[in-house]
Amino acid sequence: MADVARLAGVSHQTVSRVVNDHPNVRPQTRDNVLAAISQLAYRPNAAARTLVTRRTHTLGVISCDTDLVGPASMLYGIEQAAAGTYFVSVASLPALDHGSALDAVERLLGQGVEGIIVIAPSTSSVAALVGMPAEVPLVAVGCGTSAPLASVAVDNAGGAIAATRYLLGLGHRCVHLVGGPETSLDAQERAAGWRQGLAEAGIAAPAVITGDWSSRAGYLAGRTLAAIPEVTAVLCVNDQMALGVIRAMSEAGRPVPSDVSVVGFDDIPEAEFFGPPLTTVRQDFPELGRRALRLLVLKIAGGLADGPQPPVGTELVVRASAAPPRA
C-alpha cells in the first residue's frame, strides 16, 4: 500500500479509502490511485479489507435443476456478471422446498455472503421462498411475476408470442405446441404467449403435448403430431425437444421445413447446427445475470422494494427450420 501511495502522490489512508470504496474521495484522486494500483499490480488483502469494511464481497446463489439448460445458463450468467467484483458461493440443491431453501440460506450466511440470488424456475421453488428471513437481501431469478420478493426473468410470453406470430405470418393456419412440465414457470409462460398469439389471429388453441424438456420427449411428441395431416407448424418450448420433433418428422416422411415448420426456444449453442439449422427464440442469459446482480446490489444497499422487475427481452433468430406451408 505504501508503494501505491508514493506513486499516486497521496497518503496511505487515501489509498485505503479508495480500496474500500469510501465515497469521500475526489474523482481525480481516485483515478490516480487506481492507475497506481494497476501499474503496480497491487492486490488488497481480502481479510484485512473485510475487517475494515465489514464487507466480504461475496454473494450467494441457490439453484436446483442445474442439469437443465435454463437454470445452468442463468447460473453462468450470474457468475459472469459478478466476475472481478464479487466472489460467488453456490448452493446447488437436488430440489428446492422451504426447508432446503432455509438450510441453504443459513449455510451461505455462515460463509459471510452479503446477499443471495435464488434461481427459482418452478412453482415449488417460488413457494419455498415464502417466509425467508426478512433481514436477508434476496433476489429471485427466472420466476416471472410469481415470486414474493424482488425478481427478474426473461420475457417468456413475449418470445412465444413472437414465434407464433412468425409462423402464422408465413401462412400456417395453426401452430401446435410441444410444452414443458406443468410445474415449470417458463413452460407456463411460453404456453400463455403461444395461446395469446393464436387468439390475436382468432385461432383456437389445439391440445398441448407436454414433455420433460428432453429430446426424447420431443421425439415422442413429434411422432404423435406427425400422424396428424393438418399439423404444419410446431412451436417447442425448448430447443432440445425441437430436435426430437425434427427427428420424428423426418422418420415419418414429413421433412422439416418443406412439410412441417419447427421453432424452438433458448438458442442453445448447437441450434445453428441442427439439420436444418433451428429457428428459435434466443434468451439473453448474460443480461439476465447482470440484471440479477444489479438488483441484489440495490437490495443490499436498501434501495429496492420487493416485486417483479421489467423482464429481459428475447430475440427471434430466423434460420432454416420454418417455411411457408405447401400450397
Regions found by a protein language model. Name each.
Residues 46, 64-73, 91-100, 143, ...:
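Hinge/beta->alpha junction and helix N-cap segments in small-molecule ligand-binding domains
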Residues 40, 110-112, 166, 170-171, ...:
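Glycine-rich phosphate-binding loop signature in dinucleotide/nucleotide-binding domains
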Residues 1-57, 326:
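N-terminal helix-turn-helix DNA-binding module of bacterial transcription factors
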Residues 228-327:
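Flexible loop/turn connectors
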Residues 14-17, 51-67, 166, 174-180:
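Short beta-strand segments enriched in small/hydrophobic residues
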Residues 112-120, 176-178, 208-209, 229-238, ...:
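Periplasmic-binding protein-like
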Residues 58-165, 169:
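Alpha-helical recognition/docking segments in bacterial nutrient-uptake
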